[in-house]
Curated annotation (Swiss-Prot):
Record-given protein name: SUMO-conjugating enzyme UBC9
Gene: UBC9
The species this protein was found in: Arabidopsis thaliana
Pathway stated in the Swiss-Prot or TrEMBL entry: Protein modification; protein sumoylation
GO BP, one annotated term: protein sumoylation
Boundaries of every UBC core domain copy: 1-147
EC numbers for this chain: 2.3.2.-
Function: Accepts the ubiquitin-like protein SUMO/SMT3 from the E1 complex and catalyzes its covalent attachment to other proteins. Mediates the selective degradation of short-lived and abnormal proteins.
Length: 148
């Protein structure tokens, strides 16, 4: 069941890739993908290329995939391990969602952080109290880690 669904999503992604994202299996393992997200142009992550790993559980799509950033990113909803605080990857997951939708949600999270549900409270606090400092730090990290 899971592998059939994953294969279908891969075909759909190749046919109609989401803007500024790409994804596919690592080697022959259909349950382990790598994705690339281009930093949105209207964000401090602009120009960056962010690597993301995707692990599908055996009972996908009834359980959400585990998605994590491999590239360091300065963001209130993404911690130093690359974990992402995104409702659709947790309690808001639905089998109707696809990897394509997940990648688009991550792109919009880069553009519009959610400081009220932070994974990194210090960055959320900076975002709320000194947005210029947050944006310049995020830009610096993007240049340092995502423009290799």
């Amino acid at each position: 069941m899971a592998s059939k669904r994953i294969l279908k999503e891969l075909k759909d992604l190749q046919k109609d890739p989401p803007t500024s994202c790409s994804a596919g299996p690592v080697a022959e393992d259909m349950f382990h993908w790598q994705a690339t997200i281009m930093g949105p142009s209207d964000s401090p992550y602009s120009g960056g290329v962010f690597l993301v790993t995707i692990h599908f559980p055996p009972d996908y799509p009834f359980k959400p995939p585990k998605v994590a950033f491999r590239t360091k990113v300065f963001h209130p909803n993404i911690n130093s391990n690359g974990s992402i605080c995104l409702d659709i990857l947790k309690e808001q997951w639905s089998p109707a969602l696809t990897i394509s939708k997940v990648l688009l949600s991550i792109c919009s999270l880069l553009t519009d952080p959610n400081p009220d549900d932070p994974l990194v409270p210090e960055i959320a606090h900076m975002y709320k109290t000194d947005k210029n400092k947050y944006e310049s730090t995020a830009r610096t990290w993007t240049q340092k880690y995502a423009m290799g």
